[in-house]
From Swiss-Prot:
<keyword id="KW-0963">Cytoplasm</keyword>
<dbReference type="InterPro" id="IPR013520">
    <property type="entry name" value="Exonuclease_RNaseT/DNA_pol3"/>
</dbReference>
<dbReference type="GO" id="GO:0003676">
    <property type="term" value="F:nucleic acid binding"/>
</dbReference>
<feature type="active site">
    <location>
        <position position="128"/>
    </location>
</feature>
<keyword id="KW-0540">Nuclease</keyword>
<keyword id="KW-0269">Exonuclease</keyword>
<dbReference type="GO" id="GO:0005737">
    <property type="term" value="C:cytoplasm"/>
</dbReference>
<comment type="similarity">
    <text>Belongs to the oligoribonuclease family.</text>
</comment>
<protein>
    <recommendedName>
        <fullName>Oligoribonuclease</fullName>
        <ecNumber>3.1.15.-</ecNumber>
    </recommendedName>
</protein>
<comment type="function">
    <text>3'-to-5' exoribonuclease specific for small oligoribonucleotides.</text>
</comment>
<dbReference type="InterPro" id="IPR036397">
    <property type="entry name" value="RNaseH_sf"/>
</dbReference>
<dbReference type="InterPro" id="IPR012337">
    <property type="entry name" value="RNaseH-like_sf"/>
</dbReference>
<dbReference type="Pfam" id="PF00929">
    <property type="entry name" value="RNase_T"/>
</dbReference>
<dbReference type="GO" id="GO:0006259">
    <property type="term" value="P:DNA metabolic process"/>
</dbReference>
<dbReference type="InterPro" id="IPR022894">
    <property type="entry name" value="Oligoribonuclease"/>
</dbReference>
<dbReference type="GO" id="GO:0000175">
    <property type="term" value="F:3'-5'-RNA exonuclease activity"/>
</dbReference>
<keyword id="KW-0378">Hydrolase</keyword>
């Protein structure tokens, strides 16, 4: 099952966008093979944070994370950032060695900033490169904007769902923008 060509996809939900004041409240990972077939879903973790921090979120985050049920899950969670980091690393070790997979996702630089600050061991597990689907999106918007009509995203702002959206978005770009044929699962 371990293959250093596998890709690690990660998404974080945070209380805001500033690592100096905001915190991670949910994280999830998925491992795919190089052809983007899902091999395994990692733990989906609501990270315990104090109510005072959640109460200080801006209006958008407050509305979004309350409507999704994430605030309730965070308040009920007893999993610390450190525990979430270790659970995730233990999962990833089964599928890819440290330093081999780029960090994969959408706007992944933002997630990397929070990992550097709050989960440095997990940040170091990734290769320094990124596979950022949002880079392709920016090119499509500029070069082939008509293709954006075919991108279907649920945008639930829940970590696992967002990763699946990112994988499906990359598959769409592979077929319609990069023009590679659909790759069948070899399993």
């Amino acid at each position: 099952m371990k293959n250093n060509q596998n890709l690690i996809w990660i998404d974080l939900e945070m209380t805001g966008l500033e690592p100096e004041q905001d915190r991670i409240i949910e994280m999830a990972t998925i491992v795919t093979d190089p052809q983007l077939n899902i091999l395994a879903e990692g733990p989906v973790i609501a990270v315990s944070q104090p109510k005072i921090l959640l109460d200080s979120m801006d209006a958008w985050n407050t509305k979004q994370h309350n409507q999704s049920g994430l605030v309730k899950r965070v308040l009920e969670s007893n999993v610390s950032e450190s525990q979430a980091e270790q659970l995730t690393i233990e999962f990833l070790k089964q599928y890819v060695d440290k330093g081999k997979s780029p960090m994969c996702g959408n706007s992944i630089c933002q997630d990397r900033r929070f990992l550097y600050k709050y989960m440095p061991e997990l940040a170091a597990y990734f290769h320094y490169r990124n596979l950022d689907v949002s880079s392709l999106k920016e090119l499509v918007l500029r070069w082939r904007p008509e293709l954006m009509n075919g991108v279907v995203k649920e945008s639930k702002h829940l970590a696992l769902d967002d990763i699946k959206d990112s994988i499906n978005e990359l598959i769409y770009y592979r077929q319609h923008f990069i023009n590679l044929p659909e790759v069948k699962n070899d399993k």
